[in-house]
Every structure is written in C-alpha cells, then in structure tokens.
Amino acid sequence: MSVNSDSPILRIVVVISVMVMSQGCDKLGLGTSPTQPSGPPAAGSTVVYSAVGASDANGVGSSVPCAPFDTQCENGMGYVPVTTRQLRAQGFNVTLLNLGIPTAVIGRDFQTLGQQYNRIIAGNFIDQEMMFVQPNATLVTIFAGINEVNVVTAALGGGAGGSDPNGYMDAQVRAFGTDYTTLLAGIRTRAGSPRIVVLNLPNPAGLPYLAGTSLAQRQAAQRIAVAMTRTVVNPLLSSNLVVVDLMCDSRSYIPSFYSSDGLHPNDAGYAYIASEVVKAITSSSYPAPQNSCPAMTIVP
C-alpha cells in the first residue's frame, strides 16, 4: 500500500534505506537453508520470520507505524508486529525481520511503470526485499497487489492501453504473475522451503479510498484485483504455501477498519488481518481461498 506523498521524511528514510541495503548486502544463496517443506510450526518451536511487503508491513495507518527497516518494532500495530506478538503469546520463540518498504511494488516493471506516471515508488520486492530474507527463515509472509492495481489504473488514466484497456489490464495481471513466480523462486533459493503465507488482495472497488472516484476507475481496479486473486495468488496454494483470502472476507470491506486515507487499515483492520495470518501460520487445515464470491463483483 502507498504512503501519502506529502510525507517527505518518510520518503527520504525509505530511499536512503533502500540505497544502503541494496549496496551493502549480498544477493541470493548465503548460508544454510532448510530443504524440507514446512508445515505449521510445532508448539513452542522457534519461528524465524521474514515479512515481505509494502506499507502494510510497516503498519502505515495504524496508531504505531514502524519506520522502514525497523526490523523489530516491538510495539507496532501493523499486522506484522501484531502477528509476531500473537505468536509469542502462543508460546513460539519468534525472530522477526520486517522487510516492508512503503510504496513498494512486486517487481521493477511495476516500479518503472508507476514512476512513468508520477507515482512515488521507493523500491520493489524482488530487488530490495527478496535478497534479504533470512537463509534460515521458517516463515515468510507476502502481501502484494494493491499498489500494483493503483499503478495500472494510473497508467490507464494517463492513456496507457489506448483503444484496448482490457487487454492492457490483462497483460499487467500476467506480468504480476511472472513477478510473483520470480519472487517465490528467489525466496526458496535463499531459504529452502519455509512455510509461506501469502495474502490475496481485497477488491479496491469496495475500499473507502475509491469511494469518490469514477465508475470506470472502480471497474478497472476491480477487474485487475479479481484477476490477480483468481489467476495469480489463489493458485499458489500448496502443501507449504497458504493463502489468506482477503478478497472474499466481508471484514475487508468494513469502513471502520480503515484509516483516514481510506486505503491503509487502522488498528482494528490490522488486527483482523493479523488474526487470519496467525491462523494460517499455525493451522494444519486452514481453508482454501474462494474463487467466486460477492466481493468480486462490487461494481457492475
């Protein structure tokens, strides 16, 4: 999720942090990584947790957001630190590395596209986060999609797609899928087979930040998000990858779960997300995501 472009301090911190980490650290393949698929962690075990994400991982919109690369942020109210505290309360010994970068998108292609249409994007998951996943990670969470939807709708508003906007949107969804494949492959190259929890995205057409926009923009956002969920994220479900279904959970559309910008969750919204992430981490039978639900057709 994006941060407010009127926050210069946050932008400076993000850009400097990305530059330092990009220049000062290694690429893939460091250390010894696990090789066996990871199911739910055993009760009381050690959980080595890497969180890949954008401003949602930092808890932007909450009462206690975490600064970029404040890898612990013990009192943060975003879903990543709340998840960590809940796991510890259940007896797990959790080591957290929060890699979230506000404004980030999944890959360089979306970063370049967004910058072309004047969106502030400080980095991407593949280039600035994937390489820092702990080699001994036993748990990785990933939340991508909303910033990418906003990039594509901004491009459409700037004339991209020409006479075939649907074809353009569908091509961007395929690019998102390619990037997701690259991201997961890189994480597994680095960390072996950790338990991976990915979050599909809610339908932006039902979120407060688009409430005052045109029907065409909401239709475009819905088309992109639903396609990303159905064709990219949900099919990732496997024995060691769990999908949290934000798209079809009615709680994703409760207005009071969002901060004043209408995009980022507030404390209540992040608490809801964290509760589902914890269940996905610890359950041996977490429900599969739905591929059809009323939330997929919020606008006609």
Stretches with model-predicted labels:
Residues N58-G61, G107-R108, E148-A154, A205-A211, ...:
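Short acidic/His/Gly/Ser-rich catalytic and metal-binding motifs that mark active-site loops
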Residues T84-F92, D179-V198, A227-D245:
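A structural motif corresponding to the C-terminal end of an alpha-helix
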